[in-house]
């Protein structure tokens, strides 16, 4: 979250599931409600579960500051444990949705 804050990244993209075939593949780095990560407070304010992906909205702020930022996490949940998605339309729809939140002049998208 420190990197997200430092780089002013408004979009985070995740294309792996936390657990695949019963094995942990990725650390769940986001809170379900609110948590402190070093000097950054992260609060989840909204979650939208869709067929192939989830969009989570977070508000982040420095522990001692007044600057508040919104961060959207796009989590593609339909990637199979092995191989690639059977239909490219699923991932293409996901990419279009991610790009719809990107605007010129903002920080980078974090993957």
UniProtKB/Swiss-Prot annotation:
Coiled coil: none annotated. It catalyses: O-phospho-L-tyrosyl-[protein] + H2O = L-tyrosyl-[protein] + phosphate. The keyword rRNA processing does not apply. It is an enzyme of class 3 (hydrolase). Residues 1-111 form the Tyrosine-protein phosphatase domain. Its EC number is 3.1.3.48. It comes from the Eukaryota. Substrate binds at residue 81. Pfam families: Y_phosphatase. Keywords: Hydrolase, Protein phosphatase. Gene3D superfamilies: Protein tyrosine phosphatase superfamily. Disulfide bonds: none annotated. Transmembrane segments: none annotated. This is Tyrosine-protein phosphatase 9. The gene is STY-9.
